[in-house]
Amino acid sequence: DYISIRKSFFQKDHKNNNLDIESARTRKFQEDWDTYAIIDPKLKGKKVIKDFPLAELVDYIDWGPFFHTWELKGKYPDILKNEKYGEQAKLLLDDANAMLSEVIKNNELTADAVFGIYQATSKDENVTVEGHKFNFPRQLVDKGSDKINYSLADFISTNQDWIGMFAVTAGKGIESIISRYEKEHDDYKIIMIKAIADRLAEAFAEKLHQMIRVDFWGYSSEKNLEIKNLIKEEYDGIRPAPGLSLIHI
């Protein structure tokens, strides 16, 4: 039962030399919020984006995880030169790009998003956003007294700050595509369209995050930031994600 599981969990944590929460807080990330310059967003509140052009997402696609769908391990584009399955990887990528072109040409998938930028304050591991409290657990592993035990709440001011959040989908319309392939008994294309929609959703998240940083919030210019550097997250700000689901908004 859950009580025994909970006891076992905390006993295991104790054996792993975890800190108690008060001790971990003494090692939190410290920022001087009295001198830190907080930039107010240009757009405050919620905004909905409907039918974002898929063609504008193509350059933002990170193809690396695409190959994991097919259980091919390796980094993109190096995987295309893999001695064991490089040719297979190339064929998969060619098929993916061909299907992606058809999807864009025929408007078979729709990309929608909603995002918001709201006032926020933090205390310990909690962030309060317009009266709603969000908890961001702190790292408890004892990494040494000179190491930081982070909580995402550490990066929100204890005074007045701002926080952004968003959800995207690039999967609206996928049901009809899958249904068509099911009638054709084409399992390969079913897996392929799901993998493409997954990559488009991630690309949309990358693109939207950039739009928020540069346009809607406006705290970053990124005039010379190339796509490859963007995918490596070489920009100001972070985008912690709870997961990637193709949901309808």
Describe every region a protein language model picked out.
Residues 1-191, 195, 216:
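Active-site loops and adjacent core secondary-structure elements that bind or stabilize anionic groups
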Residues 201-214:
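Charged, low-complexity helical/coil segments in non-catalytic cytosolic or luminal regions
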Residues 223-233:
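Generic long, charged, amphipathic alpha-helical segments
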Residues 247-249:
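Conserved small/polar residues in nucleotide/adenosyl-binding loops
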